[in-house]
Amino acid sequence: MKRVVVIGGGAAGLMAAVIAGREGAKVTLLEKMNYVGKKMGITGKGRCNITNACDMSDFIKNTPGNGKFLYGAYERFTNEDLLQLLHDAGLETKVERGGRVFPASDSALDVRNTFMKLMKHYGVDVHLEEPVKKLLVDDGVVTGVVTDRETYHADAVVIATGGKSYPATGSTGDGYMLAAQVGHKITDIRPSLVPIVTEESWVKDLMGLSLRNVELSVVAKNKVQAKMFGEMMFTHFGITGPIVLSLSHTVGKLMRKKNIGTIGLDINLKPALSPEILDKRLQKDFDLYSKKQLINGMKDLLPSRLIPLIIELAGIDPQKPINQISKEERQQIGYMLQHMPLTVKGLRPVEEAIVTAGGISLKEFNPKTMESKLVKGLYGAGEVLDIDAFTGGYNLQAAFSTGYVAAMHITHPEAF
């Protein structure tokens, strides 16, 4: 019977422990926090966005951080395989907008409890509040781990410690230290899926205002580098929300380039309308409210908190009577509605990121098996590896699939 130690009780570690146990290994899971699945519990606003119902090829497209590394893992363990495993264990799921999959109960706790039940069923030995201090390696082969309590001998070890985001959940970069101890290279650790800090101070006045069905573009070198449609929100420091988090990957990439210059953001508040149609819509509203002041004539078009700002950005007196607004001024308002400008100051720190970009270098891991090329019997799974995806369930699927593959290769190497 193979002895397997899994370090970390997040999505990747839980899957690796369950599958290795199911396939007949003697599994010990070591978690440094007081319970497992802590970070899973806060994904999807506490509902746990387990995966996405899209085609598996779309998972690669939605993983800008080294998505191609996951081809092998996704071939062996798909979103359908994951949902079947959870269904067989008694967890019902549902699909929401954008293909996002959640537990039918809307409770992340049910996902964690399902994995706890499976681990108990397969005899996984779970140790809580027991951080791993070092890996034991003899002549290029892993032989176990040392914790602050004792030494565990093993035939295989899976590092599934997560990244550096949300350190309160336990992901404080321990896995990087462990991998580096045995010779692995750690790539530049940085935030991904993180709010964006802007130069403009007026964002404070809009704090808490959410925008739906808008298009956000990232602009650098006079060119749109990336854009996304969906929801965003203003904060005291800048902007956040699903499309902001996803575009933060592009912003971070641009920030690391030399001579990139200013990175701008462009908010299109009316992406469904062409400039001509929008102008006609403005004309219609202006005809209706022709005797009012401009500040009082745009309430049908915009949230009230945005109106003064758009007028100011357009450079027009808000008290000006609408029947005195020129065609050029009206078109300038239309332009601002579709090109509301912001300037990137930076990203919030990695501790506030949903996902960490960077990690253990993938060059030193086999993408078909998740085994280290440097240390036999050592595996990496989940966010500790240099992989990061957009929001929508893609990061958790990457964790589940890599955890699955690591466990299957440990227990059935002949099948690879």
Give residue ranges: language-model regions.
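Short hydrophobic core segments
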Residues: 5-7, 30, 132, 145, ...
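Glycine-rich active-site loop/strand segments that organize a redox cofactor
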Residues: 47-95
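An anion/pyrophosphate-binding glycine-rich loop and adjacent beta-alpha core
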Residues: 34-36, 41-42, 50, 56-57, ...
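Feature captures the FAD/FMN-dependent oxidoreductase FAD-binding
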Residues: 75-156
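N-terminal Rossmann-like FAD-binding beta1-loop-alpha1 element of flavoenzymes
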Residues: 3-29, 406-411
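Glycine-rich loop(s) and the adjacent beta-strand/alpha-helix scaffold that form part
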Residues: 156-202
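Glycine-rich FAD pyrophosphate-binding loop
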Residues: 21-45
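A glycine-rich dinucleotide-binding beta-alpha-beta segment and adjacent secondary-structure elements
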Residues: 127-130, 134, 308-388
